[in-house]
Regions:
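Conserved nucleotide- and phosphate/pyrophosphate-binding catalytic cores
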Residues: 143
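Conserved PLP-enzyme active-site core in the AAT-like
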Residues: 1-134, 139-140, 152-167, 175-182, ...
Length: 191
């Protein structure tokens, strides 16, 4: 409402929109169309597609010149049909939903396991596939040896953990076991 009341368009970056829809047990219609979104970048790449994001316009004014804008913005590749073709099974067979359920469930599984470590603090109550976790700074180096580690807050040492469409229970167990090894080696060292 604020955007439209101030003559602005409302764009939603939907890179993880499937995760949000699944997490809230909602629908794309409820989350996007019914809320007055004008333009959605509908994500596929972060939810299992090889490559591809779709720009979906719900606003006739924006749609008028969109083919021109798309070309001028260098978003029209010569083999676009191969990128676009992925969306057919992705949507019709609800691959988007299956993949989002998996990544959200694996994040929840990690959260449940990490909560058992007294040295760990879960910062966000994420329903999706991203966790922000405060860990001891001494854990950074050993974690970086085995996993890509992204520290989002250097001062508080908060890391970002992201699960994906292909994260397995074995991946989660390996990660949690490794955290346990780090904690154990630190405990043994300080005795």
């Amino acid at each position: 409402d604020f955007a439209h009341a101030n003559d602005m368009f409302l764009h939603v970056d939907g890179a993880r929109i499937s995760n949000g829809v699944v997490a809230l047990d909602s629908s794309f219609k409820e989350m996007i169309t019914d809320t007055g979104v004008d333009l959605l970048s509908f994500g596929g790449t972060k939810n299992g597609m090889m490559i591809g994001e779709a720009i979906v316009s719900f606003n006739k004014e924006i749609s008028k010149n969109f083919k021109y804008i798309r070309k001028q913005g260098m978003q029209l590749i010569s083999k676009m049909r191969f990128v676009s073709a992925q969306f057919i099974p992705y949507l019709e067979e609800e691959i988007w939903k299956k993949n989002a359920i998996n990544s959200n469930n694996k994040a929840r599984f990690i959260k449940e396991k990490l909560e058992k470590f007294s040295q760990v603090e879960i910062i966000n109550e994420s329903l999706g596939n991203i966790l922000f976790v405060k860990i001891p700074r001494s854990w950074n180096e050993p974690l970086q040896r085995k996993y890509p580690l992204y520290v989002t807050d250097e001062r508080e040492n908060i890391i970002r953990i992201v699960t994906s469409f292909d994260t397995t229970e074995e991946d989660v167990r390996d990660f949690i076991d490794y955290i346990g090894e780090i904690r154990q080696s630190e405990t043994s060292f300080h005795r």
